A protein has these predicted regions:
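Short "domain-exit" segments at the C-terminal end of structured domains
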Residues: 251-255
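Alpha-helical transmembrane segments and their immediate juxtamembrane cytosolic regions
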Residues: 1-250
Length: 255
């Protein structure tokens, strides 16, 4: 493959992030149609919609963890992303409290970056293969903490209900019955998926990543490089476009 990338970046990683961003925009567009405009789409809340949603968040979180060691100033970047998550929470609480976002994906990613930056020295001492395996196992074990237990399948360790108390416990993954958020990604289990991506980078290594410098679709790369800003802007833009489109469709045609 001939590389047209001269920036020194791993272009394919940007493009994968951009592709995932497009998928997320389409998913959120469907969310608007179903929840705000009343369009009937049973598949959206069925298995197809769930798998679509999970594919988006898995790629985002794994890729974010993978790319941590490619950049610098992890703590500063984490603070920026966490602040963006706080902004999303504030805006939704103010303007659309019934569809509020509390502890959404940006809050998770910012928290994961901050924790990774603080724990960078001990994390780097862990062999990448062992770190990846441990992270994957812990992700599987904590996948259902929101449902009240550790484990999977028939192997379940039920947790005390006193853990599920308030917003602080919800941040960690133990949300009480009254907690509500349209986008919820707690530290447990998702921090371990982030760290799985972090250790996956160590397994792959920079030498084997050279083919990732080759660009396949530059427009997707541009989206990937500006993913945080586009994430913050995409929902109001999509809502406005859908609203104008539906108004135009519903207008009676003039003779």
């Amino acid at each position: 493959m001939k590389c047209s990338n001269t920036s020194g970046r791993y272009a394919l990683l940007d493009e994968l992030r951009g592709l995932d961003l497009v998928s997320m925009m389409l998913y959120h567009g469907c969310w608007d149609l179903v929840n705000l405009f009343g369009i009937q789409a049973d598949w959206y809340y069925g298995l197809p919609g769930h798998l679509w949603q999970q594919s988006i968040c898995w790629v985002f979180i794994l890729l974010s963890g993978f790319c941590v060691q490619l950049g610098h100033h992890t703590l500063r970047r984490g603070a920026q992303v966490f602040g963006a998550g706080a902004l999303v929470t504030a805006v939704t609480l103010l303007f659309m409290p019934e569809d509020r976002v509390v502890f959404g994906v940006l809050t998770l990613l910012g928290s994961a970056m901050l924790l990774t930056g603080l724990l960078e020295k001990p994390l780097r001492r862990i062999p990448p293969a062992a770190g990846f395996a441990i992270s994957a196992v812990l992700f599987a074990l904590t996948r259902n903490v929101s449902a009240g237990y550790l484990g999977f399948g028939s192997l379940r360790l039920w947790l005390p209900q006193t853990l599920y108390a308030n917003y602080v416990t919800a941040y960690f993954g133990f949300y009480p019955w009254w907690f509500y958020s349209t986008d919820y990604f707690a530290l447990l289990p998702w921090l371990f998926l982030f760290w799985a991506g972090y250790f996956l980078y160590g397994i792959v290594g920079r030498q084997r990543m050279e083919p990732l410098r080759c660009s396949v679709c530059p427009p997707l790369g541009w989206l990937g490089r500006h993913s945080l800003l586009l994430y913050l802007l995409h929902q109001p833009v999509i809502y406005g476009v859908l609203l104008l489109s539906l108004i135009h469709i519903s207008e009676p045609t003039r003779p």
